[in-house]
Amino acid sequence: MNLKLQLKILSFLQFCLWGSWLTTLGSYMFVTLKFDGASIGAVYSSLGIAAVFMPTLLGIVADKWLSAKWVYALCHVVGAITLFMAAEVTTPGAMFFVILLNSLAYMPTLGLINTISYYRLQSAGMDIVTDFPPIRIWGTIGFILAMWGVSFSGFELSHMQLYIGATPSVLLVQLTFTLPHIPVANQQKNQSWTSMLGLDAFALFKNKRMAIFFIFSMMLGAELQITNMFGNTFLHSFDKDPLFASSFIVQHASVMMSISQISETLFILTIPFFLSRYGINNVMLIS
């Protein structure tokens, strides 16, 4: 299979599985399972909890002991199993636990897929800056199409969205077997555990500009999580008003929410041009 096509499929499936449930799980829990807001917030907090430490830990494994592609495959095996389990869960406590397990498996794959893509592109003598964005954009396209598929199938308030999400995970495991061997980097022999865990990065906060950048990023992350949790739920709440109950936006809230990802897709395409022409500082200022 053509290298770029293979990486595009990998990126497409990686985010397709997330798009099938990330923005609609809140509505399913609130409307169908009757969870309260605090319980929904707790479930979504599991993504952040997992993202704090799990990518680093599995990154160490991929650097020292096991090829990144096999770590990636194992993560998706766990991810598929936990999504199948989540589809059968009906209580807040159990949902938190299962989604936490899923997040512990999924969050590291966001970094691992970049590692795999970068290695393959560099091995083929390609430029990551110019060749990777057109590949990565297929991830966002996958996210959008998954949102639309779940919405037009009438599964925004159904557990079926979780079954749909598990399917790309299974396909990704199979696709991993077709990838060439990716050697263990083994670059961390003489590094301290502080460095391996990335804790020395906190020294960057001494730089005022970096501190402002990190704080700004955290605020954007918090805003995004609120939208993921309750944006779809908010739009569905209008079905109680007869004036809006049958409107397209209420019936297909995910399609409306996908405007965010469509915007992302368009801007990803412009990154190589703007970075080369204006530099990272001006690009950040514009954004």
Q: Regions from the language model: what does each represent?
A:
Residues 12, 82, 92-111, 116, ...:
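Hydrophobic core of transmembrane alpha-helices in multi-pass small-molecule transporters
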Residues 53-67, 154, 266-280:
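Helix-to-loop junctions at the C-terminal end of transmembrane segments
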Residues 161-178:
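Symmetry-related core transmembrane helices of the 12-TM Major Facilitator Superfamily/SLC fold
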Residues 100-138:
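Cytoplasmic helix-loop-helix junction between adjacent transmembrane helices
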Residues 1, 179-215, 240-245:
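Juxtamembrane intracellular "pre-TM" segments in multi-pass secondary transporters
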Residues 42-60, 255-270:
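Central cavity-lining transmembrane alpha-helices of secondary-active solute carriers
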Residues 70-84, 282-287:
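Structural signature of the two symmetry-related core transmembrane helices
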Residues 1-51, 209-245, 252-254:
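Helix-loop boundary and gating motifs at the non-cytosolic
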